[in-house]
């Protein structure tokens, strides 16, 4: 067995032992030893392999798999720009705390700076965006007469791989995230003719080489619930049963609120204190409340990042130790304004003469059912889902809220669907046309690759960036330039784009969406709904006026 083959087999075996169920592989020559080892593990049913030609989309596919499966996922690629293309996914995984392992093959390090082809200083390329940069080191030449050497190397390689998995999952830090695992591989890069497929042994019973129980990060915080309190539940909020009775503005990716409070209803209330869970990222009324110096804020998070954008948090912790009882009159008032806000949104939607992205989001929100998985694009869709009063009981909601970019959303949805398929449930993804077009190459799934069994991508197509209609850039005084430089119309034929990738698709009206989503289907499909963005500003103004 040549050194690179031995090293790759040990790494793959130990990754599986460490809990890796899925690996995304991008083709290349330098990562051939890893490719052979991964293909062997896939054939043996030890992991599921996904081959992609684009490293950028591969990274987001891995994010979708990791988030939905709650397990570390690897992306393996060759050296050079292949590694650099993981940049956006690594940044998202960092801030969303997703266990993404970048398994980067490299040339032998002595070739750095010599002009060697497809070679750059890739170890450490991601800087402080990763939890760790770990190099396995170049495997030495192996002597058939020195079994002791292989025993020592096997232990070193397995220990290093365990270190990678532990860093990615946050077992010792309570801070999951991306890790770069850089492996320089010497030639020969393919197994020898007489190779018997063996692998140096790991621990008995399939256990990891180094067992690392997860740490518990626990910081209780005393909070009196007697003052009029609202809860703001953002991305990564976690479950807090002792706060369930409180009125809660829950973002779609947070656990569903038992006592929901519409984000636009905050303007009608005067809370005396706020409990913030996770990391809010969506609503301006929420940001304004959290920044109000007259309102104490208690921040409860599950990780080490500082949870205080406005600098207004009075105390931080991981869970509340509560005392006191909420005022029943306050709870009634919050329920009344929530019901009023939800009704106002729905009434204005019904009265509006044109179909907008908000109408599409309402139709999707009304169509999902328990057991579903809903993937929401950044920009308007995730906000629209909150505005229409969506409360996702029994629904798993995903959205890339780490740094909230639109890139990689198609691939994230496909990865999430592939993981959710194990439950037998369906996945619905809602995204805008720019988000869809930006990651349309994510639709490219080879004929031999695992494909989602039940994924519907709903594209709300208003031919550009509708969110800018609602921001300062959409002010009518900028109309002479805003459509071009912010709205960015593209005139892409979504149906033709889908057909190029052999993806079933059709264009429907928003009123047909509920029936279309309810009809049985197999595989992956795209439903396109034409929408208007020119009237979004007026629609949102009418909703605010109705409140």
Curated annotation (Swiss-Prot):
The species this protein was found in: Mycobacterium sp. (strain KMS)
UniProt similarity note: Belongs to the TPP enzyme family. MenD subfamily.
Enzyme class label: transferase
Disulphide-bonded residues: none
Name of the gene encoding the protein in the UniProt record: menD
Pathway assigned in UniProt: Quinol/quinone metabolism; 1,4-dihydroxy-2-naphthoate biosynthesis; 1,4-dihydroxy-2-naphthoate from chorismate: step 2/7; Quinol/quinone metabolism; menaquinone biosynthesis
Protein name (record): 2-succinyl-5-enolpyruvyl-6-hydroxy-3-cyclohexene-1-carboxylate synthase
Cofactor note: Binds 1 thiamine pyrophosphate per subunit.
Record-listed E.C. numbers: 2.2.1.9
Stored InterPro entries: MenaQ_synth_MenD (IPR004433), THDP-binding (IPR029061), Thiamin_PyroP_enz_TPP-bd_dom (IPR012001)
């Amino acid at each position: 067995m040549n050194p690179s083959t031995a090293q790759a087999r040990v790494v793959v075996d130990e990754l599986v032992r460490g809990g890796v169920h899925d690996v995304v592989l991008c083709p290349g020559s330098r990562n051939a030893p890893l490719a052979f080892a991964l293909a062997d593990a896939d054939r043996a049913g030890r992991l599921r392999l996904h081959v992609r030609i684009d490293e950028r989309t591969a990274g987001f596919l891995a994010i979708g798999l990791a988030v939905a499966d709650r397990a570390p996922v690897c992306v393996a690629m060759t050296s050079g720009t292949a590694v650099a293309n993981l940049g956006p996914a690594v940044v998202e995984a960092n801030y969303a705390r997703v266990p993404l392992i970048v398994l980067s093959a490299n040339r032998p390090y002595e070739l750095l700076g010599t002009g060697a082809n497809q070679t750059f200083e890739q170890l450490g390329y991601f800087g402080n965006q990763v939890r760790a940069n770990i190099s396995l080191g170049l495997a030495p030449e192996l002597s058939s007469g020195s079994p002791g050497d292989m025993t020592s190397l096997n232990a070193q390689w397995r220990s290093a791989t365990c270190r990678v998995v532990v860093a990615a999952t946050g077992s010792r830090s309570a801070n999951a995230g991306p890790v770069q695992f850089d492996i320089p591989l010497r030639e020969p890069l393919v197994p020898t003719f007489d190779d018997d497929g063996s692998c140096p042994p790991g621990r008995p019973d399939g256990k990891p080489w180094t067992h690392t129980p997860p740490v518990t990060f626990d910081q209780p915080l005393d909070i009196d619930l007697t003052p009029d309190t609202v809860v703001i539940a953002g991305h990564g909020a976690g479950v807090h049963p002792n706060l369930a009775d409180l009125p809660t503005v829950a973002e779609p990716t947070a656990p569903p609120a038992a006592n929901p409070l519409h984000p636009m209803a905050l303007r009608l209330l005067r809370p005396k204190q706020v409990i913030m869970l996770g990391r809010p990222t969506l609503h301006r009324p929420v940001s304004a409340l959290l920044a109000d110096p007259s309102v104490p804020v208690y921040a409860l998070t599950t990780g080490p990042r500082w949870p205080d954008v406005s600098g207004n948090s009075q105390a931080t912790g991981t869970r509340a130790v509560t005392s006191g009882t909420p005022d029943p009159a306050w709870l009634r008032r919050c329920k009344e304004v929530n019901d009023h806000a939800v009704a106002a949104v729905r009434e204005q939607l019904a009265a509006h003469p044109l179909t907008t992205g908000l109408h599409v989001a309402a139709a999707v929100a009304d169509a999902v059912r328990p057991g579903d998985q809903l993937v929401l694009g950044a920009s308007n869709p995730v906000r629209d889902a909150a505005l229409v009063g969506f409360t996702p009981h029994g629904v798993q909601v995903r959205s890339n809220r780490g740094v909230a970019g639109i890139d990689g959303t198609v691939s994230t949805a496909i990865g999430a669907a592939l993981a959710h398929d194990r439950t037998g449930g369906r996945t619905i993804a809602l995204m805008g046309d720019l988000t869809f077009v930006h990651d349309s190459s994510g639709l490219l799934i080879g004929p031999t690759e695992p494909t989602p069994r039940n994924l519907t991508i709903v594209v709300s197509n208003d031919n550009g960036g509708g969110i800018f209609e609602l921001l300062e850039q959409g002010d009518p005084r900028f109309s002479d330039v805003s459509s071009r430089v912010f709205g960015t119309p593209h005139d892409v034929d979504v149906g033709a784009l889908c057909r190029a990738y052999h993806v079933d698709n059709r264009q429907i009206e928003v009123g047909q969406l509920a029936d279309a989503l309810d009809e049985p289907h197999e595989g992956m499909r795209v439903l396109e709904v034409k929408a208007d963005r020119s009237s979004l500003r007026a629609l949102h103004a009418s909703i605010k006026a109705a409140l």
